[in-house]
Amino acid sequence: MYYSSGNYEAFARPKKPEGVDHKSAYIVGSGLAALTAACYLVRDGQMKGEHVHVFEKEALPGGACDGYKYSIGYVMRGGREMDNHFEVMWDLLHSIPSLETEGASVLDEYYWLNKEDPNFSLCRATVEQGKDAHTDGKFGLSDKGAMEIMKLFFTPDEQLQDKKITDFFDDEVLNSNFWLYWRTMFAFENWHSALEMKLYIKRYIHHIGGLPDFTALRFTRYNQYESIILPMIEYLKGFGVQFHYDTKVTDVKFDIQGSRKMASSVTVEHAGEVSNIDLTENDLLFITNGGCVESCTVGAQDKAAGFDPTIKPGNGWDLWKKIAAQDPSFGHPEKFCSDPELSNWESATITTLDDKIPQYIQKICKRDPFSGHTVTGGIVTVKDSSWLLSWTLNRQQQFRDQPKDQLCVWVYGLFSDKPGDYVKKPMRDCTGKEICMEWLYHIGVPTDQIEELAEHSANTVPVMMPYIDTFFMPRAMGDRPDIVPEGAVNFAFLGQFAETKRDTIFTTEYSMRTGMEAVYTLLNVDRGVPEVWGSTYDVRDLLNATVKLRDGKKITDMDLPLIPRLALKEALKKIEGTDLEKILKEYNAI
């Protein structure tokens, strides 16, 4: 497996890998990484679809990419913010046919939609029950705060092992608009990994200027289950890929001889029956280790979701622990799943049932929420919320079968253990109705109407996810296994807890990249995997981000000590009349 960039490799079709007709594949899980691996097995690996088996412990595919209507109401555990430089994602989705538009791909549909209806927010944050917080597109960083971010940016990864964000940032950053935007957009907490924070800054340096108003983002038409997962499932079914639902993989055994490592058997449980599948070198095993939505609990309008982080037999953490015990190169799951109090948050899907609540939404987002176009344009954060509540409406309807006179609002709170401001209970102890009441309070509904509207004008389903942020926990090299560990003969790891270079976790792209790299490595597919977009090496993006992060202030306006200030003045004299001066002026750096 090797990396590439540019159109030459992107448009090429690889030859059929040698011996692939004699190989089979077993995939543990059916999340985005697993489905991506299956797609690349049949598309570029040209493996027979009937030789590919997907084991999913739930009754439906998709993993964390959900979006369902249950008897208790619509449920979206989360949403995905996409980027124009998700190179692997677009490499695959241009091959996946749309389910709605004949002759178009999922990428075509997505591209047209976001061209015609570009995303941007008109209100990023509120205070005092629905008033605009007037962040006004500013990061609000002092020079000291900007230097703290710069220091982290240039710190080698080796020095960031097991370090927390608070090891680098103090209140100069943590009390700024920058941190408000960042933590609520990406779900970072102060105690999370400084290494991952650095990787995020470098990965999305080209989007720094688009963070305050979300012009950096793109979204699918519907929830990601309907917009991404279902088209992938139909594509795979067309090849004859075998899906095994309600089927747990409870153990994997490895034959390790010196540096050679081979997956030798898989233990599978279905309908109470346990069976073992013996593997040979021609049987490829793709393992989704860990999982951000494991042990999640779902509440209802009149039921709290609760908080139960118990790791049960057959879930992703249990399986990874069994695997990790067999070899040090298989990672250290305990680094991620040992303290769910530091990795949880709770979300809720609020469905409006009449015309009473939408007026308050429209007052804040300044758009008609029933238009079918961009509504909030990303999350609206309640700056003075004890739960640090954020909420969003993507284009409605979010579900194909959603009534046109209803809206689906997604709400989440980073602090599930803190009492609310109106409902004086922790979010995790609140029913759907009570979470809706807290939200209604913060969007400006008069207090004498809140309970009535939460009861009769909305249906709310909460979901608690104990491990949703666990991949952000401080980590060191080796805590996540390589996608294909050194010496591995017939297996690979997939998903957010498999290690790949330079990319950032908690993204659709990361999951899909692990799937592509796993297949290309094990089948030796002779085509380049598109490298992570290299904006961090582009001087134009670096200059633009530097200026935007300081709210448009030039580097000559920095509050520098005398000696550095004189040195900068002398350096600027030396570049007068050069291309360097020209580009610095073009990007308003001087």
Please provide the spans of the model-predicted regions.
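Extreme N-terminal leader/targeting segments of oxidoreductases
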Residues: 1-25, 43-51, 545, 549-590
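Glycine-rich Rossmann-fold phosphate-binding loop(s) that bind the pyrophosphate
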Residues: 29-32
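A short, Lys/Arg-enriched amphipathic alpha-helix followed by its capping loop at the start of a domain
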Residues: 37-50, 235-241
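Glycine-rich FAD pyrophosphate-binding loop
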Residues: 42-69
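Conserved FAD-binding subdomain of flavin-dependent enzymes
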Residues: 72-112
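Rossmann-like flavin
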Residues: 99-206, 217-219
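Helical element adjacent to the flavin cofactor pocket in flavoenzyme catalytic cores
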Residues: 202-284, 288-290, 302-303, 308-317
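C-terminal segments that line or cap access tunnels to active or ligand-binding sites in enzymes
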Residues: 205-220, 282-284, 289-514, 520-537
